[in-house]
Amino acid sequence: MKKTLLLIDGSNFIFRAYHAVPPLTTSDGRPTNAIRGFLSMLRVLMKDVPTEYVACVVDPKGKTFRSDIYPEYKANRPPMPEELAVQIPVIFEGVKKEGIPFLQVPGIEADDTIGTLAKRATAEGFTVVIATGDKDYAQLVNEDVILINTMGKDNTWMNTEGVIQKFGVPPDRIIDYLALMGDKIDNVPGVPKCGEKTAVKWINEYGSMDGVIENADKIKGKIGENLRNSLEFLPTARALVTIKTDADLSEEVPTFETLRLREPNREELMDYYNKLEFRTWARELKKSSAAGEVKSLDF
């Protein structure tokens, strides 16, 4: 039976948790809504994907190679709200105290770390499950890599056929699909006014973005003009939306045993819950400790 590696897009989870959970504070005024939401999402996920091999991956501080390619990459993002910023290190602390391997690799974005680990793991016989709400990861899906789309109310599993149903193109055309549309969140320009339907139509008609470029003169109207005006930048857009699968992670993950779940230190975890006033979880942990269970999140 194949082993499963669960790769969690922690950066995506953090922002989703912050915006999904109403303001929540401790009795002395410390914000905890993102912390509570994030750890709650992990609880659901770990029940949905029972496995011994996990990594929670987050973006590093500072710029990466994409900023060298295009200095305006992510330059449009507003500053992180202070109410969230103060919760980030506490979230990281909680992940580690729960016994979940945590990765924040300097100079390498979370998606490139995840892409690289997915490729390495499948080569070693793992099935890989990527938990995210970010559509960019659809480019990694294949017979051994599955997405859990966490954007809906219930986690939705997405294989190759699921990608085609959702986006209208197969996983190996997601990069072209993204490049043609651009990405407003990451400040990656695409073809102006080219939305999902147009990108799918062009790719299905011409086979790929290269095919679209080769046939740009055949596309009529304002959208055709927009396409022709974008031809010079499209290869750069494609490079920006392509997830790397060859990052050097030899130091962080020498073997996949590095990513095996660890038994949490119950005293430290109890102290963490109590400081944050997560009383229900503290009671659950105390009860499970009395019963001799080994995992706090029902892993």
Segments from the language model and where they lie:
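Basic, polar low-complexity surface loops/patches
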Residues: 14, 34, 46, 87-96, ...
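Short, compositionally biased "basic patch" segments
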Residues: 10-12, 60-65, 80-89
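Low-complexity, acidic/Ser/Thr- and charged residue-rich accessory regions of DNA metabolism proteins
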Residues: 1-2, 229, 239-299
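Generic recognition of stable, solvent-exposed alpha-helical segments in well-folded globular domains
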Residues: 33, 37, 197, 207, ...
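Glycine-rich loop at the start of a catalytic domain that most often binds anionic cofactors/ligands
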Residues: 67-72
